[in-house]
């Protein structure tokens, strides 16, 4: 039959394609949400309890989407002792657009110039917070295709989430995640198990090319998110049940079949409501619900229709209570980065994954299924799953990826808190200057984490020059390398063999390496 899969196709696929390594980056400063409540003159608990947020990371004008992605990529390469020529595909998922033509990926190619590796597929992928997941799927599809040349794929998801003054501002944040994709991975993409929903909606969008701020319909955005979750979960359940039936297992899939369930997290409270939403789906689909103790006390909701429940407080309250233990077991740990740093848009759901890996041992993770719900306004959404390898022995791939993230909490704790008025001043500075030419950023370089790339200047042709805050190991820098616009061939890129310390520098810093996006 035309278009059908050959019977022996699976034998040709690389084994256990998945996430081999993961690196996360967030800036060195945050604002406390409780202090922000006082500054904004809102009721105590509106941000901390109502949204579930404790702190919100932000960056000064010294960092932009290019520098965020450069930082997380170089950190991943260095910490995993990877050669730049082992990457065959590099794709960026972002909705932080600073150029309508030139991709972030092309800026990242500056990091590869010393290696001579230019044979790297992939560009940028954009649809609100979904771009990172689309890039991940493209990477997996490349490795499982005839185009694969045996090298790794590298996916970068990063964003700067900023909002105008008002109710949405405390749901901001900033960060980037880099994912190394390849075969024989500790976190394996379960083949054939993706439930996707695509729909036209104006829930959140950015039509103003001169502003970083979105237009948000808050109520519609929540409805779209939960509706997409309903549909994606339904499709996923049908697909995994079909797989199970082929294996002789005739049972329905439920939340209990996920070891962990992580979500795109605009704010933590929505994630808690989303897990409750999945339990509501299980409840309505269970023909024997009266025999399941988890549904005790929910009998009155047996005839509700999903589409009528998005803003039903009684349903929400009842199922949040019923799912509280499941939330603690399967989802709460995933909210570490979201609670402490805020919404990272495309990288948000992968920050949730990093949070889980950072807080559980390889033995606790081994063999578990991790459900992943990715959502981007407009809208695009997918629920898929990762299967954790069974091999949790010392030195295993699973041991290495968890070890690389074991300091995540200490890194979050090492950041510097700033007063809300300083945060507001930085937001106003971004608003006034993000589009300027002939601009030299005003933000402090000293406050950045070691190993952080930062913006040096924007010239009269909108060309951006970057430098990297050195680490104590950067002893190979040429004397006199200044902060000037220059060709990459004359500049130093720290060796991939060097390690990046996680905590901020305390000693006086040496001169910084400089990199630019070229004289074109």
Swiss-Prot record:
GO terms for cellular component: cytoplasm. The modification N6-acetyllysine is found at residues 46, 273. One of its GO terms (biological process) is acetyl-CoA metabolic process. GO terms for molecular function: hydroxymethylglutaryl-CoA synthase activity; protein homodimerization activity. (3S)-3-hydroxy-3-methylglutaryl-CoA binds at residues 44, 129, 167, 171, 221, 264, 273, 343, 377. The keyword Disulfide bond does not apply. Coiled coil: none annotated. CoA binds at residues 44-46, 167, 221, 269, 273. The active site is at residues 95, 129, 264. The modification Phosphothreonine is found at residue 476. The modification Phosphoserine is found at residues 4, 495, 516. It is found in: Cytoplasm. It comes from the Eukaryota. Residues 492-520 are annotated as: Disordered. It catalyses: acetoacetyl-CoA + acetyl-CoA + H2O = (3S)-3-hydroxy-3-methylglutaryl-CoA + CoA + H(+). Pathway: Metabolic intermediate biosynthesis; (R)-mevalonate biosynthesis; (R)-mevalonate from acetyl-CoA: step 2/3. Keywords: Acetylation, Cholesterol biosynthesis, Cholesterol metabolism, Cytoplasm, Lipid biosynthesis, Lipid metabolism, Phosphoprotein, Steroid biosynthesis, Steroid metabolism, Sterol biosynthesis, Sterol metabolism, Transferase. Its EC number is 2.3.3.10. SUPFAM superfamilies: Thiolase-like. It is an enzyme of class 2 (transferase). Catalyzes the condensation of acetyl-CoA with acetoacetyl-CoA to form HMG-CoA, which is converted by HMG-CoA reductase (HMGCR) into mevalonate, a precursor for cholesterol synthesis. Homodimer. PANTHER family: 3-HYDROXY-3-METHYLGLUTARYL COENZYME A SYNTHASE, HYDROXYMETHYLGLUTARYL-COA SYNTHASE, CYTOPLASMIC. Belongs to the thiolase-like superfamily. HMG-CoA synthase family. This is Hydroxymethylglutaryl-CoA synthase, cytoplasmic.
């Amino acid at each position: 039959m035309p278009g059908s899969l050959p019977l022996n196709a699976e034998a040709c696929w690389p084994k256990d394609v998945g996430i081999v390594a993961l690196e996360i980056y967030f800036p060195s400063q945050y604002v406390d949400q409780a202090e922000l409540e006082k500054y904004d003159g809102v009721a105590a608990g509106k941000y901390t309890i109502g949204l579930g947020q404790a702190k919100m990371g932000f960056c000064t004008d010294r960092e932009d989407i290019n520098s965020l992605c450069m930082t997380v990529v170089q950190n991943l390469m260095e910490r995993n002792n990877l050669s730049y020529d082992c990457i065959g595909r590099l794709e960026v998922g972002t909705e932080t657009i600073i150029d309508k033509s030139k991709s972030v990926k092309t800026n990242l190619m500056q990091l590869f110039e010393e290696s001579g590796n230019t044979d790297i597929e992939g560009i940028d992928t954009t649809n609100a917070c979904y771009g990172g997941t689309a890039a991940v799927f493209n990477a997996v599809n490349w490795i499982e295709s005839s185009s694969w040349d045996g090298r790794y794929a590298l996916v970068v998801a990063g964003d700067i989430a900023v909002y105008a003054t008002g109710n949405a501002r405390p749901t901001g944040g900033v960060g980037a995640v880099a994912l190394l994709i390849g075969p024989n991975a500790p976190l394996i993409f379960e083949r054939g198990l993706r439930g996707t929903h695509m729909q036209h909606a104006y829930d959140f969008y950015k039509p103003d090319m001169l502003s970083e701020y979105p237009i948000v319909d808050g109520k519609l955005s929540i409805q779209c998110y939960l509706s997409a979750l309903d549909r994606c979960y339904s499709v996923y359940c049908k697909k995994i049940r079909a797989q199970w039936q082929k294996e002789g297992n005739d049972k329905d899939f439920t939340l209990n079949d996920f070891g962990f369930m992580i979500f795109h997290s605009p704010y933590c409270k929505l994630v808690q409501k989303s897990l409750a939403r999945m339990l509501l789906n299980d409840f309505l689909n269970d023909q024997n619900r009266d025999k399941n103790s988890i549904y005790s006390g929910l009998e009155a909701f047996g005839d509700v229709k999903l589409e009528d429940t998005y803003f039903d407080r009684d349903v929400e309250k009842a199922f949040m209570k019923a799912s509280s233990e499941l939330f603690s077991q399967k989802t709460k740990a995933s909210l570490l980065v979201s609670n402490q740093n805020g919404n990272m848009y495309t990288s948000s759901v992968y920050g949730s994954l990093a949070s889980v890996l950072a807080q559980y041992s390889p033995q606790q993770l081994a063999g578990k299924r991790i459900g992943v719900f990715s959502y981007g306004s407009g809208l695009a959404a997918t629920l898929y799953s990762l299967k954790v390898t069974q091999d949790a022995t010392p030195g295993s791939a699973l041991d290495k990826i968890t070890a690389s993230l074991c300091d995540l909490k200490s890194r979050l704790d090492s950041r510097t808190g700033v007063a809300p008025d300083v945060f507001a001043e930085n937001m106003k500075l971004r608003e006034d200057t993000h589009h300027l030419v002939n601009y030299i950023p005003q933000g402090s370089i000293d406050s950045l984490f070691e190993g952080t790339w930062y913006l040096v200047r924007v010239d009269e042709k909108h060309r951006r020059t970057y430098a990297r805050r050195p680490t104590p190991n950067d002893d190979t820098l040429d004397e006199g390398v200044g902060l000037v616009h220059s060709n990459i061939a004359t500049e130093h890129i720290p060796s991939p063999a060097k390690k990046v310390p996680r905590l901020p520098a305390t000693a006086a810093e040496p001169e910084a390496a400089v990199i630019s996006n070229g004289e074109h």
